């Protein structure tokens, strides 16, 4: 306000005020009793106290608290604009005449800003004029958007054009809403403090002040809204951090801290007594019958929950690969890097490393420390999940049968043996070996009874028999190749017997005897051994003549090997045959022997044991090359006899090789060598020497060990078979072509069953007819069977 307006005085008529209840004394309040109490204003008010008009000067220097205590003798409630009148407070009395006189006497002062009217009861009512504040008035600071209707929801006036009433009872009209043009202008030029919201108390647009905007900015920026607040005030140690040596209290520990409580013991005994009397029963879960009696209903919150279908573009995240052995806290030694590998890993760039860590051996799980790259790996996994694009790969609907090779039907591959035609009975005990002669007329068998028998193949009639040993079984029997002579070789005990059965024409029999007798003259021409050579242990044996009884039976020569031979194989020309003694007590230098029929000569080609794979098991000559194949327990070696060199080593992968056979057309029309190998671990393996040292095919069709395998001789029929201890034979089709780009075709054809399993042994040997698709098998049940 201006100084002139501030210095103006205003007179008002006082009225009698009743005594308040809070005043205990009956004396009136007198100015004399306040002597010295208001010493600061005593001089200023001394001149005014003597005035006879009893004027009360209301100066702006009075405090607002004193002004608020004054009451208005009016029926109206002052409005917000009328609050400024309190700065010029006027106290009036109930006498209107005095007011009028005072108003006339104060002509120098302003006219009063109210008028007096009569209300309905005839009392005086003061009506104040509206205040028009100017720039010099503090009423200009009234907030324009302030709520003047009180705490009343605006929803009460939704059906009315106004939103409430002001202090004088006038309707406050609803603020006009901006049209589309105003909204466009507001969006272009955003006014200061604009929020785009509506104040629910006034219905007007909500505008924020600068302080409120600053408060919101601090909250958004995670700053402290309050000014002057220090979040890092020094710590106040309410409890000292210094450890005291002496206790604060030296009182001894009370006895109640280490003595059981008697009151608790009494309560426990009461509970125990109640349990014993049956008044307290242990909790038992209610049965379903009790629940039904109590009508207990259990509601399943997720009973009707339906699975939410995934979004049409949802692609599940790819799963992480399972951990390997290198991620174990105690990995195998082969996974642990050595110093060289560790140094190479540390010097390599992180992008060039095969793995992000080096395997370590901690011994036990409790010694495993924290993984330092755990957070990094999880973070990279999260990056891959939400940043890397995903592609839905359509699964290939492939019929599993289409992946199998298309094999011809067995009906198209006939002929092959399908049924048993003849059964040969006569041996006592197991029949260990058999062989069909090159003409296909006779069958020779050998068994545990020490005899060799010759049968007519088609009829099953026994034609000849000879007993070679009383104690030892005959392990193997083989016919000499060629039709010009008929010579049978049999291994019984430590000896090899060469016989000519008297079942053929005299001409063939004479030719056979001449071949055997020619060797005696050559053996006689060999110079005798020196005493030094005679003292050697492993000298080649000399062929001897049999006893007279054996000679009458047809045995012509005996080769004393001194060790048990279990494998015998002829060369294709019929002048050589090789024997193998697989016993563990057999010296390595005499385990394999090559015998020359025309010279009655025995040679030991190996002076040392074959490296790796154990003792030798079988040996065969190549059908067209001077190559000898020798099989030990785990490998097969090919030796060139002309050059005396090791040609190739085959690794079938079997634990124990039992037998093997060479394809009869190897290196002729087929363009390569093919072998089949049988093993005691139930595997039948096909080897193609041109492909690899490993087997081309591995067949596992038997439940027990495979004893013998055999190709069809001559190559007329692409058949081969195997014999197993499970009492069955399996016939296969195995065709080999001369095309180097095509592999052998192997088709299972037939499973032949007829032999009985005796002593955990089944079929012990097998052989083919030289011209027909017939095969003959020898069983542990003492019989042989012809399959046609």
Swiss-Prot record:
The keyword Coiled coil does not apply. Residues 46-82, 99-112 have a biased composition (Acidic residues). Residues 1-12 have a biased composition (Basic residues). Residues 1-118, 321-344 are annotated as: Disordered. Gene3D superfamilies: YVTN repeat-like/Quinoprotein amine dehydrogenase. One of its GO terms (biological process) is maturation of LSU-rRNA from tricistronic rRNA transcript (SSU-rRNA, 5.8S rRNA, LSU-rRNA). It is found in: Nucleus, Nucleolus; Nucleus, Nucleoplasm. InterPro entries: BOP1/Erb1 (IPR028598), BOP1_N_dom (IPR012953), WD40/YVTN_repeat-like_dom_sf (IPR015943), WD40_repeat_CS (IPR019775), WD40_repeat_dom_sf (IPR036322), WD40_rpt (IPR001680). Residues 321-335 have a biased composition (Pro residues). GO terms for cellular component: nucleoplasm; PeBoW complex; preribosome, large subunit precursor. WD repeats lie at residues 426-465, 469-509, 611-649, 652-697, 701-742, 758-788. Component of the NOP7 complex, composed of erb1, nop7 and ytm1. The complex is held together by erb1, which interacts with nop7 via its N-terminal domain and with ytm1 via a high-affinity interaction between the seven-bladed beta-propeller domains of the 2 proteins. The NOP7 complex associates with the 66S pre-ribosome. This is Ribosome biogenesis protein erb1. It comes from Aspergillus clavatus (strain ATCC 1007 / CBS 513.65 / DSM 816 / NCTC 3887 / NRRL 1 / QM 1276 / 107). The lineage of its organism: Eukaryota, Fungi, Dikarya, Ascomycota, Pezizomycotina. The gene is erb1.
